């Protein structure tokens, strides 16, 4: 289990100067050729998403105005807050900020032949599945994960195991990404 606080994470500026990324975790850890990766991006200007052949990307808008996503001949989609949207990461996708507002989004990328991610918003206590990896990011409220208290802009990631996230207040929202390994693959095989 790895814990993080977005406000204390290192920031990597994009080469095109249109934004920055905070990497939460990769699996396998510290590998450039990852099977899955979670990150938070701040987007300051219109531009294209980086290409990652063989990967799927699920992007969830956390803050800022809506973002218009366009992939020629594939889709046009308006990304709205807290509504995950998946697309192939090997296609050119242009992002256009609405009203010029900066936005922040959560990204999870998975290698299509190894694993698949599902992203959802939780508003109550839940328990994860034991054989799956995952990432949580607190949008608001106070959540208990084991002996750790997680609040706004904090989270955790894990590569397997069963974990219970308890909402400690009457209301709260948490982004949860679950990683499902495809048949013939498991975290034990790749570490």
Swiss-Prot record:
A Pfam family per the record: HutD
Transmembrane spans: none
Coiled coil: none
Gene3D superfamilies linked: Jelly Rolls
Family: Belongs to the Ves family.
NCBIfam families: PRK11396.1
Name of the protein: Protein Ves
Gene name for this UniProt entry: ves
């Amino acid at each position: 289990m790895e814990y993080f606080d977005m406000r204390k994470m290192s920031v990597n500026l994009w080469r095109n100067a249109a934004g920055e990324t905070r990497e939460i975790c990769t699996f396998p850890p510290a590998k450039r050729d990852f099977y899955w990766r979670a990150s938070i991006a701040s987007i300051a200007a219109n531009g294209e998403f980086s290409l990652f052949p063989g990967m799927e990307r699920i992007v969830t808008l956390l803050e800022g105005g809506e973002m218009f996503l366009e992939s020629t001949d594939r889709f046009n989609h308006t990304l709205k807050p807290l509504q995950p949207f998946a697309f192939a990461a090997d296609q050119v996708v242009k992002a256009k900020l609405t009203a010029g507002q900066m936005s922040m989004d959560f990204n999870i990328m998975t290698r299509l032949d190894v694993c698949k991610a599902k992203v959802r918003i939780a508003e109550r206590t839940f328990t994860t599945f034991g054989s799956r990896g995952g990432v949580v990011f607190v949008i608001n409220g106070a959540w208990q994960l084991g002996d750790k208290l997680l609040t706004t802009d904090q989270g955790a990631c894990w590569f397997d195991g069963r974990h219970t996230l308890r909402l400690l207040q009457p209301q709260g929202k948490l982004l949860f990404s679950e990683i499902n390994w495809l048949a013939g693959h498991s975290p034990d095989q790749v570490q």
